[in-house]
């Protein structure tokens, strides 16, 4: 991967994009593909499609979803803590102690999902905080009024976890599911244009996959492709 492609991947991974709030990531994707795509279009649902018009009759679509799992603020307590609910399939067993970033109209607000110190836990009692809705987020607010000055109910949030390079060519980070997919779709389109393929190629970035493939259902009725390749991540079980 050259430096330009790496920079594009880093931009996608650093841009918050929880389901239903994909606009920032889609803007970054559109800005990139607009430098080489012949056409770039969006639909009413928020999906983005960049196209190379081939001279032949065949067409393919390469798709990925732009959204990621996250949270949404559901309430604010009198003590100034936030209650959150999952957006998509967030795992409650790993959320406690996780730093998060709440996306507000005024900009990001940092917080952490509270974790009871091991010294204070009642190990004989059932652990109710395995439910994300029972967990608290501390943003440093002294009380409810102070918290409401910073955050509103309904604001989305994401884990505040960045990109880390592992050994070899592997990486770990937030949002690889599925910024990797829309990165691949853009790269396939770029290479198709470089080679001036006769096949028409659509690169597609869809929305709200984590909520039930909602964006893909809509865009699937808009693109008349002979074949569709959906790119997504899967379990590291090999």
Model-derived features with residue positions:
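N-terminal hydrophobic/helix-forming segments and targeting peptides
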Residues: 1-238
């Amino acid at each position: 991967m050259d430096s330009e492609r790496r920079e594009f991947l880093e931009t996608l991974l650093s841009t918050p994009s929880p389901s239903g709030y994909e606009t920032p990531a889609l803007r970054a994707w559109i800005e990139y593909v607009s430098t080489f795509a012949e056409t770039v279009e969006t639909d009413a649902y928020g999906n983005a499609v960049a196209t190379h018009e081939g001279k032949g009759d065949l067409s393919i679509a390469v798709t990925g979803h732009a959204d990621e799992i996250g949270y949404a603020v559901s309430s604010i307590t009198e003590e100034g803590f936030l209650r959150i609910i999952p957006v998509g399939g967030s795992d409650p067993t790993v959320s406690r102690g996780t730093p998060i970033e709440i996306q507000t109209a005024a900009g990001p607000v940092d917080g952490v999902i509270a974790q009871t110190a091991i010294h204070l836990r009642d190990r004989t009692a059932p652990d109710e905080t395995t439910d994300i809705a029972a967990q608290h987020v501390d943003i440093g607010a002294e009380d409810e009024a102070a918290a409401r000055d910073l955050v509103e109910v309904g604001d989305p949030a994401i884990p505040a976890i960045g990109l880390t390079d592992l050994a070899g060519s592997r990486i770990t980070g937030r949002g690889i599911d599925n910024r990797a997919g829309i990165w691949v779709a853009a790269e396939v389109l770029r290479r198709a244009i470089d080679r001036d393929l006769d096949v028409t190629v659509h690169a597609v970035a869809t929305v709200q996959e984590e909520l039930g493939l909602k964006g893909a259902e809509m865009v699937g009725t808009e693109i008349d492709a002979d074949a569709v390749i959906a790119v997504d991540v899967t379990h590291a079980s090999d």
